[in-house]
Swiss-Prot record:
It comes from the Bacteria. Belongs to the universal ribosomal protein uL3 family. SUPFAM superfamilies: Translation proteins. This is Large ribosomal subunit protein uL3. One of the primary rRNA binding proteins, it binds directly near the 3'-end of the 23S rRNA, where it nucleates assembly of the 50S subunit. Keywords: Ribonucleoprotein, Ribosomal protein, RNA-binding, rRNA-binding. Residues 128-166 are annotated as: Disordered. The gene is rplC.
Length: 209
């Protein structure tokens, strides 16, 4: 069991014992620090607030800078909470969480923010089939078609799939296998793809499902 914050480096391939190429994602996982310890008595639940990365103190608000100062740390780039049950032992504010909380072969969930695609049409965003390519039609190839009824219901239903902003959403990819752990360089290699572009921040937690 473990939990850590990290940065997506990119994708590569490794070869297994059957000489098969396995697509993998390389993640710089930690080292993280405990910015705050939350308890049931004080906060209503048990959790560790982890910090990752470094940020110029001028670029954080004074309350946030003071929050880091309580833990004896310089401002981090990312703050995120993880359940105490995911990390063995009792940690105090300022303690370090390294990549060695995970082992090779462990199954994890990776949380991140998907790549932003901007404003996208219905064919790209919702996989619509588009209009017919025949009978002389010329400009409706990627059009959405009708979005509502005539006199009944006389409105467009809420939630109707239309063009709009695509991507940039929180996403969890579950049940990825850790192929390799490299404590000396703070790297984890997981089988498969994880959300987001290169250099985006992710959270890795042991799977609970």
């Amino acid at each position: 069991m473990g939990a850590i914050l990290g940065k997506k480096i990119g994708m590569t391939r490794l070869y297994n014992n059957k000489r098969e190429a396995v697509p993998c994602t390389v993640i710089q996982a930690g080292p993280c620090f405990v910015a705050q310890v939350k308890s049931t008595e004080k906060d209503g639940y048990d959790a560790y607030q982890l910090g990752f990365g470094e940020r110029d103190e001028k670029k954080v608000t004074k309350p946030l800078a003071g929050h880091y100062k309580k833990a004896g740390k310089t401002p981090g780039y990312l703050l995120s909470e993880v359940s105490k049950s995911l990390i063995a032992g009792e940690l105090e504010a300022g303690a370090t969480v390294a990549v060695d909380v995970f082992t090779e072969g462990e199954i994890v969930d990776v949380l991140g923010v998907t790549k932003g695609k901007g404003f996208a049409g219905v064919v790209k965003r919702h996989n619509f089939g588009g209009g017919s390519r025949t009978h002389g039609q010329s400009d409706r190839l990627r059009a959405p078609g009708s979005v509502g009824g005539s006199s009944d219901p006389s409105r467009t239903f809420k939630g109707t799939r239309m063009a709009g902003r695509m991507g940039g959403e929180n996403k969890t990819v579950r049940n990825l296998e850790i192929v390799k752990v490299m404590p000396e360089s703070n790297l984890i290699v997981v089988k498969g793809a994880v959300p987001g572009p290169k250099n985006s921040y992710v959270k890795i937690v042991s799977t609970t499902k």
